[in-house]
Amino acid sequence: MEKLKALIEVTKPKQTFLLMITFLVSYIVARGGADFNFVIAAISMFLAISGTTAINMWLDRDIDAIMPRTRKRPVPAGILKPSECAAFGAAIFAIGQVLAFLVSLEFGLVVFFGLFFDIVVYTILLKRKSPYSIVLGGFAGAMPALGGWVAVQGFTLPGFIIAAIVLLWIPSHIWYISMHYEEDYRMANIPMYPLVVGMERASWAIVFATAAMLVLAASLYVLLPLGIFYLVISTSAVAFFLYKAVKFALSPDRVKARKMYKLASMTLGLVYFSLLLGVFL
């Protein structure tokens, strides 16, 4: 039972759930509802995200063992062997990848590039070397949203915008939490952007990304037949977050950074919830 719990834990259920929300909503907006293809695509994406995350946990086991925040994870804690974590991640990703190509070639490519950007670009090449790691690695986090659209409509502009909203949100998600746990990242020698350039400069980078996110959220109202509820809720949520981000940037604080991290997740959730309202109301 402990092994099963550990296998579930290495997929980071909360993170996977949030990414699946972006996929599910994107698919429903593209289709106008759900169908049988939706079930196959959803299973595929869930397995792909979970597998990629487990592989990531395997690769990061050494730095996870250093940071107090992560040292109790299954692999550094010794509950799972590194080989078990790697094999589990690779197996479920492979199943997800096969299912993805059954949905469509385009969807299969999106799933593959999700793994590529997360594992190769972010974790292996950039995370331990560059403060700009999430700028390119962040593309992985946007792939589920893009995949939801591509599974239905292929590669068209609205899908890229829906994915770009997530991409622009990622700096707030990653950098705020790295500000709060600054000492952990220093101990593990991870050159996160806020640690290298300072909290103030990183905070203003988040402000600019959020401002662009607001523009893209509004543009979807023009491009897609979404109701007024979408426009009001999405732009209000992002505008409020932008206000709080500016306020934080004027006076950065490690304790408040955790609150901003949580607010960032709520903001993205509201944007995607408003997309659903826009389709059905």
From Swiss-Prot:
Enzyme Commission number(s) of this protein: 2.5.1.141
The UniProt record lists the keyword Membrane: yes
Membrane-crossing residue ranges in chain numbering: 16-36, 38-58, 75-95, 101-121, 129-149, 150-170, 202-224, 228-250, 261-281
Molecular function GO terms recorded: protoheme IX farnesyltransferase activity
Gene Ontology biological process: heme O biosynthetic process
UniProt enzyme class: transferase
Keywords, in A-Z order: Cell membrane, Heme biosynthesis, Membrane, Transferase, Transmembrane, Transmembrane helix
PROSITE patterns in UniProt: UBIA
Membrane topology category: Multi-pass membrane protein
InterPro entries per UniProt: Protohaem_IX_farnesylTrfase, UbiA_prenyltransferase, UbiA_prenylTrfase_CS, UbiA_sf
Catalytic reaction equation(s): heme b + (2E,6E)-farnesyl diphosphate + H2O = Fe(II)-heme o + diphosphate
GO cellular component: plasma membrane
The keyword Secreted appears for this protein: no
Matches recorded under CDD domains: PT_UbiA_Cox10
Pathway as given in its UniProt record: Porphyrin-containing compound metabolism; heme O biosynthesis; heme O from protoheme: step 1/1
UniProt subcellular location: Cell membrane
Misc. comment: Carbon 2 of the heme B porphyrin ring is defined according to the Fischer nomenclature.
Protein role: Converts heme B (protoheme IX) to heme O by substitution of the vinyl group on carbon 2 of heme B porphyrin ring with a hydroxyethyl farnesyl side group.
The protein's name: Protoheme IX farnesyltransferase
Organism: Archaeoglobus fulgidus (strain ATCC 49558 / DSM 4304 / JCM 9628 / NBRC 100126 / VC-16)
Gene assigned in the entry: ctaB
